[in-house]
Amino acid sequence: MSRGKHKPTITTERWRFFVEGKVQGVGFRQGCCRRAMDLGLSGWVRNLPDGRVEVQAEGTPMALSELRLWCERGPADARVSQVRPSQLPITGADWFEIRS
């Protein structure tokens, strides 16, 4: 077996999660932002007028999977009924923020 100088490539993906249930007014955006930053993700989270929360995050598939698991639970006072995921094109964002 030859030893090449190939470096493993890190796959980056971007996903949108629409989070439904009692997810506004319970600290969901703040908790999501903290978790995303802990996972090294970039993107944003915001409340929607219809009561849902929208999350767009970019990073490794493993980190995105961890964020989705967090979104399915949310903070202690949240009652998540459903998370609807969809994959998006990568934008190359550098940070994670809370949008209004």
Swiss-Prot record:
Keywords: Hydrolase. Its EC number is 3.6.1.7. InterPro entries: Acylphosphatase, Acylphosphatase-like_dom, Acylphosphatase-like_dom_sf, Acylphosphatase_CS. GO terms for molecular function: acylphosphatase activity. It catalyses: an acyl phosphate + H2O = a carboxylate + phosphate + H(+). Pfam families: Acylphosphatase. Residues 14-100 form the Acylphosphatase-like domain. The keyword Hydrolase applies. PROSITE patterns: ACYLPHOSPHATASE_1, ACYLPHOSPHATASE_2, ACYLPHOSPHATASE_3. The active site is at 29, 47. Belongs to the acylphosphatase family. This is Acylphosphatase. It comes from Synechococcus sp. (strain WH7803).
